[in-house]
């Protein structure tokens, strides 16, 4: 099962790609679907694509909920593989 997870933008590479922190690892992701991204923004990541921006509070709530459900590690592993 693939989950979309919140990730933090660490570096903007160009209009289509950025580096995000996924479970403590830095991975290049596709951000072509979003406008006006800045370093520090949080996005929803699914199969290597940033789909939507969200605020930090919502990102933290979502990550905490996934961790509580025991699915965060699985989602991060899937995202790390997809973002390569």
Curated annotation (Swiss-Prot):
One of its GO terms (molecular function) is carbon dioxide binding. SUPFAM superfamilies: HupF/HypC-like (SSF159127). Gene3D superfamilies: 2.30.30.140. Pathway: Protein modification; [NiFe] hydrogenase maturation. Transmembrane segments: none annotated. One of its GO terms (biological process) is protein maturation. It holds the Pfam family HupF_HypC. InterPro entries: Hydgase_assmbl_chp_CS, Hydrogenase_HupF/HypC. Belongs to the HupF/HypC family. Involved in the maturation of [NiFe] hydrogenases. Involved in the biosynthesis of the Fe(CN)(2)CO cofactor. This is Hydrogenase maturation factor HypC. It comes from Azotobacter chroococcum mcd 1.
């Amino acid at each position: 099962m693939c989950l979309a997870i919140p990730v933090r933008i660490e570096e903007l590479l160009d209009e289509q790609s950025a580096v995000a922190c996924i479970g403590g690892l830095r991975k290049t992701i596709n951000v072509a679907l979003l406008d006006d991204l800045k370093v520090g923004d949080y996005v929803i990541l699914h199969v290597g694509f940033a789909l939507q921006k969200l605020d930090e509070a919502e990102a933290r709530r979502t990550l905490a909920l996934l961790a509580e459900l025991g699915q965060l590690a699985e989602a991060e592993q899937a995202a790390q593989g997809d973002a390569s």
